[in-house]
Amino acid sequence: MEKQMHIAMLIGALTKGGAERVLVNLADYFVEKGYRVTMVTQYERENEYPLNRKVNRIISDITEEETGKSRLLNFGRRFLKLRKIWKKERPDVILSFIGKNNMMAILTSRFLNIPVAVSVRAEPSEEYYTPLLKWLARHLFARADGVILQTRRCFDFFPAKVRKKAVILKNPISQSFFRERYEGERDKTIVAVGRVDANKNHEMLIRAFAQIAEEFPAYRLIIYGEGELRPCLLDLIKELNLTDRILMPGSIDNVADVIYKSAIFVLPSNTEGTPNTLIEAMIMGLCVVATDCPCGGPADLIENGYNGILTPVMNEEKMKENLQFLLNNLQKMEELGKNAAKTADIFRPEIVYGEWEKFLRSLT
């Protein structure tokens, strides 16, 4: 009988974000297919994605009693604790997501004969934003057995010795988004979904919508998500006297159901990897507008004017013009949405999960 393969996954926490959702989806797929899966997170937070009960969850952070005043000593304790986890669990492969977790996965598993795959989920220069982190990423990743990147542009950040072991793997998308495209009269809503922080730049979208709100009085802008900037944006909406036209309901679990009949989906981010929310909206056949941001995720998905609209980063005026154009051209909006729905063909779960499975198995 073939030995049950054991996959360990490492991430900071399972709070609601794109990378976390991808990893939770992967864990669910592998454990349901008969793999043994251990999810190692540094923390356990409120408002996390639910994890399949068959997945073993381990918290790797040091306890309050173990925490001292020295940051260096605390790092050493975290390092040793994570290394002990690898020694005890003996996974066949470690899959790490995001930033410093990737470095810790490589360092703590040294000489344990456990293959490591690290995944950069955003623009590398944003994830490794200091000269030291940049240097460490470029050198340490050469010691990984596999490197997973989001777009071709990401390859430029790394030296040849990293690029030669790097691959692009698509994001696994929840089955709930794969449904027949809605062909009826659409709700007069423009929607955005994502963490409410500076990088997502919902402020630009709010200000752009404010410029056309009077021209299109039937339309509302709805931004779904939580984050540190939510109170500030609610204040801005109040200042603009648009509290009845721009809504921020917070985080939701049933995204597919809620945005299914929406007129336009907007991604206003300053930087992105390959955005789950954009893929999900396109799969369901929404008309999409997205910033042409680094590291090129939206541009990899959208053929401008065919299956969506690409708009310049941090350009409120262009965002306004693109929304205005679409709301004045409903036939074009419908055409873009129909073409966007064709994206579903390349993101079928059986295809995407199969690519991840094949890659991880190739490392063992």
Which sequence ranges carry the predicted segments?
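N-terminal strand-loop element at the rim of the active site
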Residues: 9-17, 21-25, 29-73, 157-159, ...
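A conserved mid-protein helix/loop that constitutes part of the nucleotide-sugar donor-binding site
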Residues: 20-25, 188, 192-217, 223, ...
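Short His-centered aromatic/hydrophobic patch
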Residues: 96-102, 120
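Carbohydrate-associated surface elements
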Residues: 153, 172
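Aromatic "clamp/platform" in nucleotide-sugar-dependent glycosyltransferases that forms part
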Residues: 251, 270
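Short hydrophobic beta-strand element within catalytic cores of glycosyltransferases
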Residues: 287-292
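Conserved acidic donor-binding segment of nucleotide-sugar-dependent glycosyltransferases
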Residues: 303-305, 309-316, 325-330
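A short, well-ordered alpha-helix in the C-terminal region of glycosyltransferases
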Residues: 318, 325, 332-346, 355-358
